Amino acid sequence: MSIDRLLKAQKQENLEIVTAILDDGSKPDAEYTIEHHFSSTNFDRLEKAAVDAFKAGFEVNDAEEMELEDGSVIFCFDAIAHHKLEVEMLDKACEALLVLAAKQKVDYDGWGTFFIDEDGNEYIDDDEYVDDDEEFEEKPVH
């Protein structure tokens, strides 16, 4: 699929996700942690994408190895940004990251964030509060 088609689909998904999160009552003016997901079967390509994302101003976490259901292995990392949950900002970031992914021949797998209540607390799901002082397995809303 061309970058233009991918971007058009991603922009539609951005709008749907932001609308759903805010309609569920997530705090509209909070600063969100946005995790943009990348993956590849080629570690070297993924590493180059991580360097490019870092140079573009994103925080980048360490690459992880994951085994898929079919037994194959992929590598993945997140490029992380912190900002309000605004569709326009997400659209710009997604466009830049889709171009980066195409350049490095890796997959951009969308983004995720957490629900934030009126008190500014992040939630993994409806009843699991994220305590920054405790370790937890992250499970973004999307």
Curated annotation (Swiss-Prot):
Which UniProt keyword terms apply here?
Answer: Cytoplasm
- Respond yes or no to whether keyword Cytoplasm is given for this record: yes
Looking up InterPro entries in the UniProt record yields: RraB (IPR016716), RraB-like_sf (IPR036701), RraB_dom (IPR009671)
Any one GO CC term of the record = cytoplasm
What SUPFAM superfamilies has UniProt attached to this entry? Hypothetical protein VC0424
Its annotated compartments are:
Cytoplasm
- One Pfam family per UniProt: RraB
One Gene Ontology term of the molecular function aspect: endoribonuclease inhibitor activity
Q: Does the keyword Cytoplasm apply?
A: yes
Q: Which family does it belong to?
A: Belongs to the RraB family.
NCBIfam families attached here?
PRK11191.1 (NF008393)
Complex and partners: Interacts with the C-terminal region of Rne.
Give the protein's function. Globally modulates RNA abundance by binding to RNase E (Rne) and regulating its endonucleolytic activity. Can modulate Rne action in a substrate-dependent manner by altering the composition of the degradosome.
Spell out the protein name for this chain: Regulator of ribonuclease activity B
Q: Which organism is it from?
A: Shewanella sediminis (strain HAW-EB3)
Name the gene. Answer: rraB
